[in-house]
Amino acid sequence: MVEEVVRRLDIPDGVDVQISGRSVRVKGPKGELSRELWYPDIEIKREDSKILIRSVARKKQHLAMVGTIAAHIKNMIRGVTDGFEYRMRVVYSHFPIQVKVADGKVAISNFLGERKPRFATIVGDVNVEVGKDEILIRGMDKEAVGQTMANIEQATRVRGFDVRIFQDGIYLVEKR
């Protein structure tokens, strides 16, 4: 007989979770997130104030996917209650890097003295605030916040120089 794998997640007060077919919708004080979560032989149900993620198959892939789906739902719940915030620091030695936000993009000017600005796209519904030497990235969707941070970091990647000497760029300092 095949054992089933079950993960239970508690739904905190003030959060509403709706599951219909493959889609999971989470509403909270900060807003609403919706996502398609599906894998064969895995079902997602809501029972009272808990979410059940159940797999009938006992294969490694199914065990892993039960944990993955549970982690996605936990991140959605955390996103609508607390949100995610990444703090980045602008580091330069000689040429002062200037950062501006406009039209869903982050414009990075004067990087290593370059005349042409570099651009990084802002993914999804993410808020980017630019300070003097600091950038704050806030949002409900962890993946969108992380991808925006990665886009900014990759836009200031040093190519063709020794990175031990040319340490200019925009780097992640803190995740909350």
Curated annotation (Swiss-Prot):
Family: Belongs to the universal ribosomal protein uL6 family.
Protein task: This protein binds to the 23S rRNA, and is important in its secondary structure. It is located near the subunit interface in the base of the L7/L12 stalk, and near the tRNA binding site of the peptidyltransferase center.
Domain of life: Archaea
Protein name (database record): Large ribosomal subunit protein uL6
GO molecular function: rRNA binding; structural constituent of ribosome
GO CC list: cytosolic large ribosomal subunit
The organism's taxonomic lineage, starting at the top: Archaea, Methanobacteriati, Methanobacteriota, Stenosarchaea group, Methanomicrobia
Keywords: Ribonucleoprotein, Ribosomal protein, RNA-binding, rRNA-binding
UniProt subunit comment: Part of the 50S ribosomal subunit.
Name of the coding gene: rpl6
Biological process according to GO: cytoplasmic translation
